[in-house]
């Protein structure tokens, strides 16, 4: 079997034995896959620095359905030196990769999400990291995967949200006040900004006022925790870095 040449991002790596490595890749052609890289820790000719987390690479992979594929060789397309030189940007890039790793099915192509991750890492390479752009990435990821909260109407009864906005429940669900009397307020301004994020593919165009940013963060944190099913390790690192920079 001849290896396929795939466009890929390195999502995670796991050392195996004395010299091998298991690599999670997010590819344009096959979505998320896991591949076994034999002697990856010893062979700089075949891999070099290409297996660093969030590196964009050309991966030579023998695809195996229902098991570990074989990573034969990898060349770097972009190592993102600007991100790697800044601890804050590293934290956001690691979080984005772990989120994709946790949220996506294996072996299912997701070209829109591949382009979203590419755009986010390109943005982090060129500009300082920000919470607003993290939220832009998150809501578009949820939308692509079919998990985003209903922003126009109550998820229970279907009634369009009025000027009072919505109420946010613990699982990230947004409902009207006729369906529940409990929950965190989500104003129409917040809902409108979240919807605006879905109407442009460009980072840096949508600005969240402080209240809207806080409400958006609460909604996305709850939705992501619910759908990911476990706590992301990189999220703790991201929060630590964010607190130190305040």
From Swiss-Prot:
GO biological process: DNA recombination; double-strand break repair
Keywords: DNA damage, DNA recombination, DNA repair
Entry's transmembrane regions: none
Pfam families, sorted: RecO_C (PF02565), RecO_N (PF11967)
SS bond list: none
SUPFAM superfamilies, per database record: ArfGap/RecO-like zinc finger, Nucleic acid-binding proteins
Gene Ontology cellular component terms for the protein in this record: bacterial nucleoid
Domain of life: Bacteria
InterPro entries: ARFGAP/RecO (IPR037278), DNA_rep/recomb_RecO_N (IPR022572), NA-bd_OB-fold (IPR012340), RecO (IPR003717), RecO_C (IPR042242)
Function, in words: Involved in DNA repair and RecF pathway recombination.
Protein family (similarity comment): Belongs to the RecO family.
Protein name: DNA repair protein RecO
Gene: recO
């Amino acid at each position: 079997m001849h290896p396929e040449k795939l466009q890929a991002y390195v999502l995670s790596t796991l050392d195996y034995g004395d010299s091998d490595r298991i690599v999670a890749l997010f590819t344009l052609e096959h979505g998320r896959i896991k591949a076994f890289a034999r002697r990856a820790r010893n062979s700089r000719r075949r891999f070099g620095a290409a297996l660093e987390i969030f590196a964009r690479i050309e991966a030579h992979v023998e695809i195996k359905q229902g098991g570990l594929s074989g990573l034969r060789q990898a060349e770097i397309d972009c190592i993102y030196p600007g991100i790697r030189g800044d601890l804050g940007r590293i934290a956001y890039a690691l979080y984005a990769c772990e989120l994709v790793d946790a949220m996506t099915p294996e072996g299912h192509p997701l070209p829109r999400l591949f382009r979203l991750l590419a755009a986010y890492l390109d943005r982090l390479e060129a500009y300082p990291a920000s919470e607003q752009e993290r939220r832009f990435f998150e809501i578009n990821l949820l939308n692509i995967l079919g998990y985003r909260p209903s922003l126009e109407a109550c998820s229970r009864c279907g009634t369009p949200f009025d000027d009072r906005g919505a109420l946010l429940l613990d699982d990230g669900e947004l409902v009207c006040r006729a369906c529940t009397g409990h929950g965190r307020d989500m104003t129409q301004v917040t809902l409108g900004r979240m919807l605006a994020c879905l109407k442009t593919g460009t980072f840096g165009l949508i600005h969240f006022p402080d209240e809207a940013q806080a409400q958006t963060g609460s909604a996305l944190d709850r939705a992501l925790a619910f759908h990911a099913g476990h706590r992301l390790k990189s999220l703790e690192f991201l929060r630590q870095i964010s607190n130190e920079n305040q």
